[in-house]
Amino acid sequence: MMRPPEHQLLSSLDQRSRDIFRLIVETYLNDGDPVGSRNLSRLLPHTLSPATIRNVMSDLEHLGLIYAPHISAGRLPTQIGLRFFVDAFLEVGDLPPEERSSIEAQVRAAGTSNSVESVLTEASQVLSGLSRGAGLVLTNKTDVALKHIEFVRLEPMRALAVLVMQNGDVENRVIDLPAGISTSQLIEASNFLNAHIHGHTLSEAKSELRKLSEETRRELDQLSQELVAKGLAVWSGAGADQPARLIVRGRANLLENVHAQEDIERLRHLFDDLETKDGMVQLLDLAEAGSGVRIFIGSENKLFSLSGSSLVVAPYRDSEQRVIGALGVIGPTRLNYARIVPMVDYTAQIVSRLLR
């Protein structure tokens, strides 16, 4: 069944229907249980008979906003209903000052180690602890400025290519050396690369080298030229343009309040997705597509659609306002969105400041 656009859907609901719908969703977000007409009649601020409430619930069900998980059960919001609630009714306020202070203190304390890894790990830990979901942070290595590259000979025909980022990260790859290359040629190749890649991102550095004139290339002998080509090409293989790091904390939180076999199966799918990290670059694309916090519910979240999870995610940026990663919270569809949205937003702001 095709549902009408959100503004038409909202205008089609009278105040009584809106109140009942909001109460059904809020009850679900609080405890995950279906709510029936008798309980609703006690919870509503104005008096309505259970029969009247059942008629309203029937209309809401016809619109695809709620459903009955069992014949004799109360009602739960559908995925469409949750999306409608988030878009039309969710009231997001500011984080309490004490939570803002706690987030900033913990993430900044990790920043004193001058390790990007520490900052990102602490951010995911903070989000996990405050949300009772799983906190995740994703960063894309191709958007990090390079500091230098060097080659360390391991064997006559093999060397370790060491790529150092300006944020302190270090990545290593083992490469095959051109036959007959000398130690002085290794040094010459690394010096040449460093003269042209410093301060550039990996993708920019590759582009810069492609633009070099033939005359500039002739500064190197043939073997050194081969090594220069291999030096950055080693980061061009499968997965090189994928996010370099996915940090997840708080998986155990997702096991709380799991009752049904269906819930366990959904969690299995989610854990598998988090473990394989397949398609994680899409998460950066999703975050970058919006200007702030984005909410993906159930199948809207293509990465974790089989798990029936919700994802609240925001980008964090470098000093030039380029998106260099994303952070957020993943959990059941009954996340406390009103609390988690400002939490994710503020954490992204703090991480952005620390990484500039």
Swiss-Prot record:
One of its GO terms (molecular function) is DNA binding. InterPro entries: GAF-like_dom_sf, HrcA, HrcA_C, WH-like_DNA-bd_sf, WH_DNA-bd_sf, WHTH_transcript_rep_HrcA_IDD. GO terms for biological process: negative regulation of DNA-templated transcription. Pfam families: HrcA. Keywords: Repressor, Stress response, Transcription, Transcription regulation. SUPFAM superfamilies: GAF domain-like, Winged helix' DNA-binding domain. Negative regulator of class I heat shock genes (grpE-dnaK-dnaJ and groELS operons). Prevents heat-shock induction of these operons. NCBIfam families: hrcA. Belongs to the HrcA family. This is Heat-inducible transcription repressor HrcA. It comes from Brucella canis (strain ATCC 23365 / NCTC 10854 / RM-666). The gene is hrcA.
